[in-house]
Amino acid sequence: MDYLQAMRLREANRLMIAKFKKESPANDSPEQRLVRLTNENPQYNVDFLFHSYSKDWFVSDVGMKMSNVMIPNQMLALDCEMVLCEDGTEGVVRVGAVDRNLKVILDEFVKPHKPVVDYRTAITGVTAEDVQKATLSLVDIQEKLRPFLSAGAILIDHPIVIDTSLVFKYPNSRKLRRPSLNTLCMSVLGYEVQKAGVSHHCVHDAAAAMKLALAVIKKRVDTTITLTKEAEKSRLFLHRIPHHLSSEELKKDLALKFFPKNFTIDVKPAKTQGGYYCAVVIFGSSVEANQAFENVNGYKETDSSGLPQKLISCSISTFYVR
């Protein structure tokens, strides 16, 4: 596909989406309502305002074929495992997809086209050996998915077109915070999809996103979610952790600093090379979490939301806990 053709397709798709936004919400199908909830969220453009066209992009021709805005019910949930590449960008190394019936239609490793510096195995479950055995490129994956998207199917993930992190929300007092996929699964579906200390699986995460969308479509569950007070208060959030402090070193430091010592850590990797990362420390109860926060040595202050936090020092750096 050449540049001009891609731009024509993109413009046709843009016009189709613009027409959809002008349509009355009263005419929406349940599936379209979720798309609208995603598109109308104030944070949507923050995540989805991309460049007009990039070399490796696949641009569909849906807008060229459809004279009227579609009323689709075909949905596809997708999830990817990402690694950190040598140039500081992220690369896709595994893709999983399920259909509306939760049937697995894709679960493949992807051969990255850039050198990898961090496989994030503890998070992704992907090893260097897995990637070395991969034979499919990202273009191959696009071609495998293309038949499932050709009829204007809706893409679901945390986060993609139906972005479950934008569909579901916390109460107004916490409107800038987005619920994690695990939080949504515990609150809406009643189970953990990502257990602390256990690596992710893209097929399981894709299936969880599909189940969340179906819960709204079929069961009409409330999209305003809250953690139980006990579950919310049993966690401490660590942020602005420097990249040179490895997750293993972090765990060793916390084992020395935190009391009680019976806790698990869920690390969220940095998006860019050299960037800060964050982590959630999960205790058995709110009492234990409060004890750990009060017992740890650090400079006490408040964050931008007015929540108490501490700047604590470790063997080679500092970070915040709240």
Curated annotation (Swiss-Prot):
Localization (cell): Nucleus
Main location: nucleus
Keyword terms, alphabetized: Exonuclease, Hydrolase, Nuclease, Nucleus
Every Exonuclease domain range: 75-213
Gene ablation phenotype (knockout): Plants do not show a phenotype alteration due to the redundancy with other SDN ribonucleases.
Entry's EC annotation: 3.1.-.-
SMART domains in alphabetical order: EXOIII (SM00479)
InterPro entries (UniProt xref): Exonuclease_RNaseT/DNA_pol3 (IPR013520), REXO1/3/4-like (IPR047021), RNaseH-like_sf (IPR012337), RNaseH_sf (IPR036397)
Domain of life assignment: Eukaryota
GO cellular component: nucleus
One GO molecular-function entry: exonuclease activity
Annotated family: Belongs to the REXO1/REXO3 family.
The protein's role, per its UniProt record: Putative 3'-5' exonuclease degrading single-stranded small RNAs.
Protein name, entry field: Putative small RNA degrading nuclease 4
Organism field: Arabidopsis thaliana
Encoding gene per record: SDN4
